[in-house]
């Protein structure tokens, strides 16, 4: 609770300095990362709603970040309706072309309430994986983009699940040394040229990477 409120307060103060900035309220997986949440709908909606209430006073829109199933996305959207704010959806694909739930990106189009949808991103994915899925996310016909990571892999492994609260994910998943700000920006420019309008970094990206993104033409 403290961290959610504190982050909101800091973001809100920063917005006073930069009025054109929009503050996103991140709503990440409420259970395991990179795994579909198979708990009951009541449990999931309660978790999303509880976090959304904490950050709602500080944010302009909500961002569902690194979700691994369409069910989670639908429940998440339902959980924030009372706040009447737009939202961005960030889906995760560890490897290949399917969400951890086994669903495809194209399955989203018939399952999303798009009335306040700002767009869809592939979230916490490698540049190479975004490239594989670029055409399919583009074919959704809505604003799209990415949050690129710098991990060697994000495919779940048993010890990652077991130690998720006690181990550093960077140690378990490995960190790439080749994705310098310059290299990451080259990927981002390529995706921007292909139509991506939502550009961002996730795990193992640094302020220097984001600065490089901000300078793209």
Language model features: what each stretch is:
Residues 1-217:
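Domain-level signal for soluble alpha/beta catalytic cores
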């Amino acid at each position: 609770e403290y961290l959610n409120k504190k982050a909101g307060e800091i973001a809100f103060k920063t917005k006073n300095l930069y009025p054109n900035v929009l503050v996103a309220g991140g709503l990440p997986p409420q259970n395991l990362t990179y795994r579909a949440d198979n708990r009951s709908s009541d449990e999931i909606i309660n978790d999303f709603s509880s976090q959304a209430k904490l950050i709602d006073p500080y944010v302009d829109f909500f961002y569902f970040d690194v979700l691994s199933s369409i069910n989670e996305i639908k429940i998440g959207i339902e959980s924030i309706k009372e706040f009447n704010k737009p939202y961005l959806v960030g889906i995760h694909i560890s490897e290949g072309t399917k969400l951890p739930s086994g669903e495809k990106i194209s399955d989203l189009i018939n399952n999303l309430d798009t009335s306040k949808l700002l767009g869809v991103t592939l979230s916490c994915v490698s540049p190479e994986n975004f490239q594989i899925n670029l055409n399919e996310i583009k074919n959704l016909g809505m604003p799209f983009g990415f949050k690129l990571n710098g991990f060697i892999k994000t495919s779940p492994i048993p010890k990652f699940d077991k130690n998720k609260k006690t181990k550093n994910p960077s140690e378990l998943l490995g960190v790439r040394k080749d994705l310098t700000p310059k290299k990451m920006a080259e990927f981002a420019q390529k995706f921007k040229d292909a139509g991506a309008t939502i550009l961002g970094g996730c795990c193992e990206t640094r302020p220097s990477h984001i600065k490089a993104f901000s300078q793209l033409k």
